[in-house]
């Protein structure tokens, strides 16, 4: 990893952590977020996925997944927005209400992110479970 940010191909989004920390304010951070359409609040899934899909970045890569064999799967913001909305609709169809907990047992696969953002779109609480912890904790 290069020691100096001027040697990077893509500049870092926070080149001076100490300055960013000293100048941080919640009001400025909130101003960077879109909020839900019609001013209905804030949803992290909308901020992380939907606003990018709706603002001309729909064909940009949102997730790049590399499997154990080295195969690559790119998922665009448009695709991720659609998949996560479908997951949120499935949850609603199952009777999951805002504030309910949704537990997901999955490996580090693209569907884990779909489930996470879909759950957050449904205004439910996402709780990942990982088999690596063994059967006792699960």
Model-predicted regions and their roles:
Residues 43, 78-82, 129-132, 136:
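Conserved phosphate-coordination/catalytic loops
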Residues 48-79:
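AMP-dependent adenylate-forming
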Residues 49-52, 80, 84, 102, ...:
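Adenylate-forming
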Residues 85-89:
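Solvent-exposed alpha-helix faces
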Residues 70-75, 90-133:
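Conserved AMP-binding/adenylate-forming
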Residues 18, 136-137:
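Short acidic active-site motifs
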Residues 1-46, 52:
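Flexible, non-catalytic linker and terminal segments flanking ANL/adenylate-forming cores
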Residues 84, 112, 138:
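Aromatic/hydrophobic pocket-lining residues that form the small-molecule binding cavity
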């Amino acid at each position: 990893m290069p020691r100096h940010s001027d040697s990077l191909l893509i500049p870092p989004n926070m080149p001076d952590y100490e300055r960013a920390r000293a100048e941080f304010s919640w009001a400025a951070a909130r101003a960077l977020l879109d909020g839900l359409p019609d001013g209905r609040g804030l949803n992290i899934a909308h901020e992380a996925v939907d606003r990018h899909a709706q603002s001309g970045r729909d064909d940009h890569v949102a997730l790049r997944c590399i499997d154990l064999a080295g195969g690559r799967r790119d998922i665009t913001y448009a695709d991720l927005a659609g998949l996560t909305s479908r997951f949120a609709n499935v949850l609603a169809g199952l009777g999951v209400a805002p504030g309910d907990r949704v537990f997901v047992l999955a490996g580090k696969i693209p569907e884990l992110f779909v489930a996470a953002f879909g759950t957050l779109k449904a205004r439910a609480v996402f709780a990942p479970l990982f088999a690596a912890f063994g059967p006792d904790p699960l």
